[in-house]
Amino acid sequence: MNAVTETVDLQAPPSPLIFTDSAAAKVKDLLAEEGNPELKLRVFVQGGGCSGFQYGFTFDEAVNEDDTVLDKNGVQLLVDPMSFQYLVGAEIDYKEDLEGAQFVIRNPNASTTCGCGSSFSV
């Protein structure tokens, strides 16, 4: 009799979108300044920019039925389905350096990016 052993990896699959602690902390600070606990950060992709697509950020109170919602340290990040397809595997971060402070999206799907960092193509 032959025994077959199968190994199953029970770890959760990687998140399709990474929302860093640094980004969540900055959003939490901005929300405190706004004084509206119902606000969430919405990230989106739209046509435009010098490379074809550009990223956008806005605060939104409404969560649409088809939104992807990520919770991080009490902050919600919203992404609509059209934008999500361009952001799968991306990291949304906040950085402060000599060039200034800004939200940054590191997107493995972008084949080219603009020098400004807010425009890309796939």
Swiss-Prot record:
Q: What InterPro entries would the database entry show?
A: FeS_biogenesis, FeS_cluster_insertion, FeS_cluster_insertion_CS, FeS_cluster_insertion_RrpA, HesB-like_dom_sf
Recite the UniProt keywords alphabetically: Iron, Iron-sulfur, Metal-binding
User: One GO BP annotation here?
Assistant: iron-sulfur cluster assembly
Q: Name the coenzymes or cofactors required.
A: iron-sulfur cluster
Superkingdom of source: Bacteria
Return one GO MF term: iron ion binding
For this chain's record, the cofactor binding note is: Binds 1 iron-sulfur cluster per subunit.
- The record lists iron-sulfur cluster as bound by 50, 114, 116
Q: Where is the signal peptide?
A: none
Please explain the role this protein plays, according to its UniProt record. Required for insertion of 4Fe-4S clusters.
NCBIfam families membership? iron-sulfur cluster assembly accessory protein, PRK13623.1
Q: Supply the HAMAP family for this chain.
A: Fe_S_insert_ErpA
**Protein family (similarity comment):** Belongs to the HesB/IscA family.
Name of the molecule in the record: Putative iron-sulfur cluster insertion protein ErpA
| Species lineage | Bacteria, Pseudomonadati, Pseudomonadota, Betaproteobacteria, Burkholderiales
